[in-house]
């Protein structure tokens, strides 16, 4: 124990806590760490400015050299005036400015690509709102080195969709692929190299009805809105044609003002044929010999390009007017009643005709567009300016105010329509050229006021013998009643008369039939009827049963027995 006690710094009572060393007063008091960490707040603006000033003095920051951070975005006011021709090129990939606006030309493409093929103005743009670059994917993209070699391609060959050799109906995991057709009996599809070969023979009326009826109450369709027929809709229509022979396209809004242009663009770009059209609904047939595997494939647009800058539609001094006249027309247009009211996402098929008819009686016409986007009714005004034609005066208060222009000519040159004077009509005193001259009023004292629609209805009634022109105006009540009775008889005879013949056989039987050759073929508008009446003799349908087994044959036998 004496030896152990002689050792220094040895605690004989190890179980007891050792005495802690004396804390140095210079080092400060010891504080244990808190159970919850203290949050670190951002430095104040004063401290931040001091630090930044200190850094700029000692170690100045280098400017950011990343070009991606310098590109303009939708909040920047980018504007660059352009001229007609090539504005950007990358090898064979060029961006053009022409009559069709901004178009993109790719090597091997059948036509110049655009964002919208139907809603591009006919006026050349004067500037662009973003740098000229392609909205398509680049042809090649180098793979960055990731430390590993790229994966090998799969050896499994995935079969492509082939309309001529579709997968079997009972195969699991494969959707239905529509076969080509309809084809006459005994004929087979063949590969088509151009549009005429893919379409094949023209469809008959009963074939059109057979193709359209399943789509009448089906919502599987392509919706066409304010942008019109866009580039990516080409691939969308072909994806519809993969499953069905007819693609239903429903148009609403701005494109319906000029449906003829929409139908023309659809047939040109897709290669199909429009077999039926009702209002804003179009039925697009793919063709008898269509094959999804050999369809034309186009690159998709990855984003919507910014619309270019076009000249202003509303000029302060329109062509053919002075500044005072334009101001007077705009003031009088505020009290003018609109001819119609356009609803949002509506179908404006008859708008151009209504504006032309309104110009027959007034030099100013106003169309009300409540609730429409400003870009929508401005596009509608641009279309009316080109199709009617007319001069745009104002877009104030969501209304389109138009003037028919100096060079306007009436469609009714022989019998011009004379507007009636009324207190509510303020358009009669707008243009002195609109007032009828005294010679016209004296020469035609019996001219009545009527709209072009009523005149067309009267002409149709005269042609169908439902109306008659009275040559004598001074008729008594009895004579007028006789004329009315004669008209009723002729109209009923015209409606219920048809060519019928009665042929008597030796047995005394009689057969009645109607000759349908003289029946006028109207435009195909109603598909709820039967379409089997236009089958040709060489391609007639197969008989339903043996001869003499139909119920009609039994009725004929009974009639023959009675006649005997």
Curated annotation (Swiss-Prot):
GO terms for biological process: Group II intron splicing; mRNA processing. It is found in: Plastid, Chloroplast stroma. Keywords: Chloroplast, mRNA processing, mRNA splicing, Plastid, Repeat, Ribonucleoprotein, RNA-binding, Transit peptide. Residues 1-43 form a transit peptide. Gene3D superfamilies: YhbY-like. Signal peptide: none annotated. Residues 14-73, 420-448, 526-549 are annotated as: Disordered. GO terms for cellular component: chloroplast stroma; ribonucleoprotein complex. Residues 526-541 have a biased composition (Acidic residues). Disruption phenotype: Plants are albinos. Essential protein required for the splicing of group IIB introns in chloroplasts. Forms splicing particles with CRS2. Interacts with RNA and confers intron specificity of the splicing particles. This is CRS2-associated factor 2, chloroplastic.
